[in-house]
């Protein structure tokens, strides 16, 4: 971001099993552990390098019911979402909004988008976004049905799992929304 580094290794990991409570009938089974790593370089290192077109981040901790939305207590209750409905509403609002912002800023439209990868909180959010954007389900990549919500790793992991199938020229949007109401998006040109 400051122009000093030419190479970086970006890591993300979440050990959600430290938080979840299997006896919780509403959420105990929804979480998964995962990690992902990406090597980013200013110079090309292979013929199949993808380009990060743009990145956008935003903190929305002041919005809605953010301060009370999610509680992480490893040894005392696990992950609790007393304001889960508000998290759902804000995620369904800001994930597509962030992608549309980046597309427009960089001279693209939804028609240019090859794949959409959203934070893997639940499939209801992805279905809601697909309807809002009028995008076919085939453009949405996901792994939540096999891994659960892997937290901050979820979108990066979906990208990594599908990297082999991206073709030269594909435009991939990745967008996230966390329980702390941190949100963002990234456009990648393959």
Please give the residue ranges for each predicted region.
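Phosphate/pyrophosphate-binding loops at sites that engage ATP/ADP/AMP, CoA/4′-phosphopantetheine
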Residues: 97-114, 162-166
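Claisen-condensing/thiolase-fold acyl-transfer catalytic domains that form or cleave C-C bonds
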Residues: 1-4, 114-190
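Flexible, glycine-rich active-site loops centered on histidine and acidic residues
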Residues: 3-34
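Acidic, glycine-rich active-site loops and adjacent beta-strand->loop/helix elements
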Residues: 12-17, 58-60, 146, 176-181
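Acidic-glycine-rich active-site phosphate/pyrophosphate-binding loop
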Residues: 5-16, 67-72, 125-137
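Phosphate/ATP-binding catalytic cores across multiple sugar-kinase/actin-like superfamilies
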Residues: 94-105, 128, 132, 158
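Condensing-enzyme catalytic core mediating Claisen C-C bond formation in acyl metabolism
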Residues: 22-93, 97, 177, 190
